[in-house]
Amino acid sequence: MIFDEDSSSVAQESGYMGVGSPYSSDVGRISMSDHWNKLTKPSSIKVVNHGNALNKADLIIEPLESGFALTLGNALRRVMMSSLRGFAVYGVEIENVLHEFTSISGVREDVTDILLNISMIRLKLSGMDNKVLSLKVKGPCEVRSGMIADTPDCTILNKDLLICTLDQDVDFNIKMYVNSGKGYVPAVKRKSINKFGLSDVPVNFIATNALYSPIKKASFRVESSRIGQFTDYDRLIMSVETDHSILPDEAVALAARILQDQFQQFINFDETDEPHQKVDTKDVLPYDSNLLRKVDELELSVRSYNCLKNDNITYIGDLVQKTESDMLRTPNFGRKSLNEINELLASMNLHLGMKIANWPPESIESLSKQYSEE
């Protein structure tokens, strides 16, 4: 498969064309770090669970640069589905059974059906990569995965899964071999390379299909987001369902870490090579520069700005120490103005109700001026 796209189409799509754009001859004057530092980064990652099910959740990530939600969402989804590691049964020993193409006296299901059911067992090991589980049952009864006793290092996650049905007074004894892996490994592939992880393969060992992925479902959708008056930003909503071995937000975090590790190999420059990135410690000040900005620098509606002005709120540092209740008690300040301010603060990784020690600082005017000149 070949994917090709020229810079002119990217420029048109992004709105960068003509003199002074990143795609013109002025590119040599752009600081290297500007390529990533001047992009909008998500200021909010919200996890919304589906009712009481901790294994199902939507992750809402915003704001993102236009087009980034599709790029990141597709990459995260594919990595989650294919590359996260989990545990699965990869082989069994069933007493008095030499191969899968047979039946067991007194057992309703044949061996192929039993193996299919066993491959659907979801479990989690702690402190180890492989283990042998034993199950001994006497009929008549339904044999379920919950009959495999939990141990300190092994937890069965779907205890109601039916393994087989014993219709008669028969013994059903089975050993299940568990290990860690990723993706889906069919039994035929494991047999073809003799990869069982065993020093001595038992004569009645039967390989099973192994589904290691802890992800049951993963999808995403893209919506519009806004910062202040600008609406050309993306909101990414990742919908993730796991097998209970990890939480949805953990799955997304692991996928992001895998991508980070892979992309690191493409970076062929040293970020510390840029002279302008050297920091003189005598110029380091104790406050986030955004806190020292004046509220009249924000792109607020006239109503919102006048409300702040009338309440003697001059700096963003003054604003963030107010609670939502404080703001709503301000004359003429309503829910619409509150949402506007919350969105602007979120874009700076700030929020209402913050506690800032020793505020306001002495010489706040000079500090504000110093930050504005940086």
Swiss-Prot record:
One BP term from GO: DNA-templated transcription
Annotated region (Alpha C-terminal domain (alpha-CTD)), positions in chain: 282-374
EC annotation from Swiss-Prot or TrEMBL: 2.7.7.6
Domain of life: Bacteria
GO cellular component, one term: DNA-directed RNA polymerase complex
Region (Alpha N-terminal domain (alpha-NTD)): 1-270
Keywords: DNA-directed RNA polymerase, Nucleotidyltransferase, Transcription, Transferase
Subunit structure, as described in the record: Homodimer. The RNAP catalytic core consists of 2 alpha, 1 beta, 1 beta' and 1 omega subunit. When a sigma factor is associated with the core the holoenzyme is formed, which can initiate transcription.
Assigned protein family: Belongs to the RNA polymerase alpha chain family.
NCBIfam families: PRK05182.1-2, PRK05182.2-5, rpoA
Protein name: DNA-directed RNA polymerase subunit alpha
Organism: Ehrlichia ruminantium (strain Gardel)
Gene of this entry: rpoA
